[in-house]
Structures are given as structure tokens and as C-alpha cells.
Amino acid sequence: MGVSVIDDTHLQAATSAQELVRVEGLRKTFHSGSQEITPLDGISFSIEHGEMVSIVGPSGAGKSTLLHILAALDTPTNGAVYFGASSLESLSETELAEYRSRAVGFVWQRHHLLPDFTAAENVAMPMLVRGEPMGQALRAAYDWLSEVGLADRAAQSAGELSGGEQQRVAIARALANRPALLLADEPTGDLDERSAENVFELMTRLHRSHHLTSILATHNLSLARRTDRILVLDHGKLVPGVDGLRGSAGSTAAYPAGTEAHISGDLG
């Protein structure tokens, strides 16, 4: 590919386009012994710039697999993912590494912080990997910790923080390189109800203030309903009539018949 999708000009072009992410005919299969597993089975959808979209569905529906492919942490068996006008498949390994570190931020269910490092050092890690000087990275990390309400915890070891605080640090780390696309895989799954609510409110505020495009996989239906749209995955497919369902942040259209069973049934 002649020009990187993530140089300044092309990143700006991708994020100013109405459609930031497009998925076409995405299929993922792997083998477990003699059995073929298909976590994603030919799904297609698009996400507009600035949307906050939730993905819900039963365990094993393909939510995590989808996010990993969108983050270029896994590759599809068939189909394509586009970031702006560029297909991820067309990117070189160097460009994919830049895409992962610059265009995308990822929040995991388990925060994956380094427990013996301070909160600020954890947030600074992505910037250090990109070659920023230590002092500059730590100053930026402090600013991000201030945004998530943890400026007073900057010098504290990550392992000493509460679960909700650790996830706030993880969110700050995911945003440290100022990505256009934020992916979150069950970011509130390990938290109590109050902490989950606080973390979701924080993500919503940051989504708006930093003009992010956010995709959230969650089992929490009450949170999903507060995003702009809900996509329901079941057995690797988008549920017909539910793709594009509006959450309360969008229109107040009624849920299609049977939707409640899909999104509030066995999501464990």
C-alpha cells in the first residue's frame, strides 16, 4: 500500500468521513479437534463517525471475536473490515501496528495493568512504545488520569487500586494515543453495579468530549440501551430485525418482537 491509513492526513480523512467502520461478509472459523467452530458467520454492518454502539448476545455469540478482528488482533477467514476507505487486509504489518497503536484504543474486561507500576506509568506505556520521552509521556498520563478522576492516584501502584479505579486507569491508557475508535470488551463485567455505572458514565462522557467512535460489547442490557444503537449477535449472526436497533441515546423506536428474549435472555 503506497500511503499509510494512519498518517496524519489519512487518519484525519478517515475520522471526518461519515462512515468510520464498515464490515462486509465477515466470517471467522477455527477447528477444535475435528469440530469446526464458527464464531462469526457472514455479518455485515457499518458504524458512523461519532456513534456509540453496543453489541449484545449470549456467551459464544462472537462478540469478543468481532472486537478482536476490528482491532486487527485477529484476522477473519472471509470478508473485510474497512477503516475509512482502507481495508485492514490491504495494510502492511508496519501499518497494522500503527493502526493498533494509533487508530484504535482497547478496553478489556480484565484491565491487564502492571500491578507494581504506578497508575501514571501504566497510562504512559502506549506513549512510550510510540517513542515519546518519559517526562512527556508521564505528564500526558497525569492529564489523562485527571480526566478519569484519578489525579490523586497517579503515583499509587495499580495493584493497590480498587476494581473501578483500575478500570478507569485502563480507560485512560486506551485513550493515551488519542485513537479515533474505542473498542471495549465487557468493560464493566468484573465490577459491582455502582462501579459499573460510574465506569459507563465516564466512557460516555469521554466518548462525547473526545469525539470518539465507540463499540461496546456488554452483557449489561440497561447500559446497552443507553448507547446510540444496539447490534445483537446470536450464533455468529446478526439477529434479523434487530441490527440497527436504536438505544435511548438515539430514537425511541420500539424494540422489534422477540428482541427482549435475545438481549435479556441468557447473556451469561
Kindly give the residue locations of the regions a language model identified.
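ABC-family P-loop ATPase nucleotide-binding domain
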Residues: M1-T29, P240-G268
